Swiss-Prot record:
Topology of this chain in the membrane: Multi-pass membrane protein
Acidic residues bias locations: 718-728
Protein name: Metabotropic glutamate receptor-like protein G
Residues annotated as glycosylated: 73, 126, 262, 313, 343, 378, 546
Signal peptide annotation: 1-23
Alphabetized UniProt keyword annotations: G-protein coupled receptor, Glycoprotein, Membrane, Receptor, Signal, Transducer, Transmembrane, Transmembrane helix
Gene Ontology annotations for the cellular component aspect, listed alphabetically: plasma membrane
Cytoplasmic side, ranges: 413-426, 485-500, 573-586, 638-772
InterPro entries per UniProt: GPCR_3_C, mGluR/GABA-B-like, PnrA-like
Ranges of Low complexity composition bias in the record: 740-753
């Protein structure tokens, strides 16, 4: 028990001793450190953090925090609430980006009785009651780095990277590097870029690569990280470690020269003074004759000649023993002309013909004669283009299909007199082919280099093409339905001129919707970044529209869906047509089914996230497949029959008198329900010679007598071309109708006298033969 009491008393004594040594309760001493970037950067921030950690260890400070922040607004927003509410004793603002915000907060509470926080910032202005400033001679170490570069280069071409004014640092330090190299090696050529920030690894890497491509074999920088050095090493050169971190400890002999900052020597006396609430004192760091105060530690590679080391060490000794105001960077033969050109002030204390005023050194920003300045480095985004092989392949296939469609048009025109072509109406076949032609052209645009016109044009072409193709198919199907869904066999006039408005209506709807999309949708080409698998500096040209345009596009898709569903429904209604001659209805149905199936596959794919190139490939291939399938299904059987049976249609199906079971059944059913009003068919077997392009599909007047529904009658109804010659006779021969040839018995049974005053209807007894 006595031992425990003794141990407690001993600890209390030690604690009191610590408190009395520094005059402050270390347990309650709170310190905050602000860094501009992560301290794992193997550069400037790493060394700052290392100095902070060493101070904490030596002084026994435990309540410390590190925050990564940069810029005035962010720094103030972070720091001010902590100073107001957390009783912070000391704040180290280590970056130039912290200076303004930290100065402003310090001024707000200068002389405050409640907030005793002291601030450390970068700079050389006068200290205040709660603010001190720290600076180090960055020009001298860059001058030494330049001396090494001038001695070590083999190509006499050296380069440099700096943040520039936009990054918060004038190029006076670039000048110091160049001057050291030029004075030791007058033959050197010097090239440099501004990066625009202390930390931008992407720009640094690319700018370094360009300097290497120019022939530079030694490259220095005043940036925070080691991106430049990594690029140099990756290209097989030796790197310089010029960002304050001992790079040779990490990269070994790949780094031929490096210097490091010893921030512990700067921070330790400053924090000690803050512990005792002493008056803030500024601090200055540089090469120093006293090793305990020397801020820079230099390390060389094994292959550096001793003569080079000797020259550098002699230069460092000169800098240590010479006032900063007359260092070579401030006083030289080039300075007077430069100062006169850029309105800088020369020194009033030292040689006015060579020495610039100390404060004016930091206004040196423009290049001296002999310095080649390339400006701020900008990364040009690289366009990722659509796969050339896919683009060429789709274009070639589309071109071949266009040629096939054109040949098909020629074939339709050439064989328009053949029964196979005439039975399907050549003009509608041309419509279908023309729609396919437009679609194939749109597919070529779909995989072409994008611009605003292509974005709009390809959508116009594809939608108009499909409207023409599908609209013609649906209208033809609708005609079939009207003809076969006619149990009373009444007169049904369906001429081509009656069908044209329906096709035109499909196109008009499409044009209206596309016009709305074009005017309101803002459909245009944009350079998209950050999509798919694009790199940070890559872009892809895509077509983009606003929400209004997307809504109209969905409306267009819904319109096509309704058009297809109508076609599918009508095709289903005529599925029971059993006459082989009219199997085009099934072909049209198959086409619509194929299109519907493809669309139901495509739409979910389009809704789900896809890479733009994959989306383009799917849409292009689907468009080619749908259109090609439609053309083949409709036209291949027709041209085969032309090839097989000749232009005159020798196939017996156009001459046989085959009855339609469906139509006959409907006629007989209607006959049984209308006894006493029996009809006979007066049209007989109409041959294909009666067909023209302006047909009137019809059945005889309802009050005439009919005997049977034959294939000839149905064929006449379907082909659109059966009685246009009769129409012409009605127009040109004073309403005389030349009826088709019928048999003698039907003629005798159908004669009706027509005296001037019409007598009561004469009852005609039909032949037994026609009773069946």
């Amino acid at each position: 028990m006595k031992k425990i009491i003794f141990l407690v008393l001993f600890l209390i004594f030690i604690f009191k001793d610590i408190k009395s040594s520094y005059g402050v309760d270390l347990v309650n001493f709170k310190m905050i450190t602000l860094l501009s970037n992560n301290f794992n950067d193997l550069g400037f921030n790493n060394m700052l953090n290392q100095g902070k950690v060493n101070v904490e260890k030596q002084l026994g400070i435990t309540d410390t925090k590190v925050y990564i922040v940069d810029g005035y607004n962010d720094t103030k927003a972070l720091l001010l609430p902590m100073v107001q509410n957390e009783d912070v004793d000391f704040v180290m603002c280590t970056s130039l980006g912290h200076v303004e915000a930290c100065k402003e907060i310090a001024k707000m509470y200068e002389g405050s009785l409640t907030i005793k926080t002291q601030f450390m910032v970068r700079g050389s202005s006068n200290a205040t009651s709660n603010l001190l400033q720290v600076t180090y001679n960055y020009a001298s170490i860059n001058y030494i780095s330049g001396v090494f570069a001038g001695l070590y280069t083999k190509t006499n071409k050296i380069g440099f990277l700096s943040p520039g004014l936009l990054g918060g640092s004038a190029d006076c330090f670039v000048y110091a590097y160049w001057l050291g190299a030029k004075q030791i090696n007058p033959k050197i050529e010097f090239y440099y870029y501004n990066i625009g920030a202390f930390l931008n690894s992407d720009k640094t890497t690319r700018a370094t690569a360009e300097l290497l491509d120019m022939g530079c074999d030694v490259i220095g920088d005043t940036l925070d990280d080691f991106s430049a050095g990594n690029t140099v090493i990756s290209r097989g050169f030796k790197a310089l470690g010029t960002n304050g971190f001992p790079q040779r400890e990490v990269y070994g002999e790949n780094v031929v020269f490096s210097y490091s900052y010893n921030w512990t020597k700067i921070f330790l006396p400053i924090v000690k003074n803050a512990l005792v609430k002493g008056k803030p004192k500024n601090n200055y760091a540089d090469f120093n004759i006293d090793p305990t105060l020397n801020f820079y530690d230099i390390s060389y590679g094994f292959d550096v000649p001793q003569d080079t080391k000797t020259k550098i060490n002699d230069t460092i000794s000169y800098l240590k023993s010479t006032p900063r105001a007359i260092h070579p960077t401030n006083c030289n033969d080039l300075m007077l002309k430069y100062a006169e050109k850029w309105n800088l002030t020369m020194s009033t204390t030292y040689d006015r013909t060579k020495c610039i005023a100390g404060s004016n050194f930091f206004f040196i920003n423009e290049p001296f004669p002999g310095m080649t300045y390339f400006g701020y480095y900008n990364i040009t985004n690289t366009q990722v283009k659509f796969s050339p092989s896919i683009q060429i392949g789709v274009s070639i296939v589309s071109g071949v299909l266009i040629a096939i469609v054109l040949l098909s048009m020629v074939g339709v025109y050439k064989y328009r007199a053949s029964s196979s072509i005439r039975s399907a109406s050549p003009i509608f076949l041309i419509f279908i082919l023309f729609g396919a032609l437009i679609v194939f052209g749109g597919i070529i645009l779909w995989v072409s280099e994008l611009n605003d016109h292509v974005c709009n044009g390809r959508l116009w072409m594809v939608t108009l093409g499909f409207s023409t193709l599908i609209g013609s198919l649906v209208v033809k199907n609708f005609r079939i339905w009207l003809i076969f869904d006619n149990p009373e066999l009444k007169t049904v006039k369906i001429t081509n001129y009656q069908l044209y408005p329906w096709v035109a209506c499909c196109l008009v709807i499409n044009i209206i919707l596309m016009s709305i999309l074009t005017s309101l949708g803002d459909l245009r080409e944009v350079d998209a970044t950050g999509i798919d698998s694009l790199g940070k500096y890559e872009f892809l040209k895509i077509c983009k529209m606003n929400n209004s345009g997307a809504s109209v596009l969905y409306t267009i898709l819904a319109y096509f869906g309704a058009l297809l569903l109508t076609g599918v429904f009508v095709s289903w209604k005529i599925r029971i047509v059993d006459i082989e001659e009219f199997n085009e209805s099934r072909a049209i149905a198959h086409t619509l089914y194929a299109i519907s199936f493809c669309l139901f596959v495509i739409v979910p794919l389009m809704i789900s996230p896809l890479e733009k190139q994959s989306e383009t490939i799917i849409l292009s291939v689907a468009g080619l497949f749908i259109t090609t399938a439609a053309v083949l299904i409709i036209f291949l059987p027709k041209f085969y029959r032309v090839y097989e049976y000749g232009e005159e249609g020798t196939n017996e199906m156009f001459k046989s008198k085959k009855s339609s079971n469906i139509a006959t059944a409907r006629a007989e059913s209607h006959k049984s329900s209308n006894s006493g009003n029996h009809r006979t068919n007066r049209r007989g077997n109409l041959v294909s010679g009666d067909f023209t392009d302006d047909s009137e599909s019809s059945v005889i007047e309802p009050n005439q007598e009919v005997a049977d529904v034959t294939s000839g009658a149905v064929l006449a109804d379907f082909t659109e071309e059966s009685v246009s010659e009769i129409d012409e006779n009605e127009k040109n021969h004073n309403d005389e109708i030349e009826l088709p040839e019928i048999n003698q018995s039907e003629q005798q049974n159908s004669e009706i006298e027509q005296p001037p005053p019409p007598p009561p209807p004469q009852q005609i007894e039909p032949d037994e033969k026609n009773q069946d």
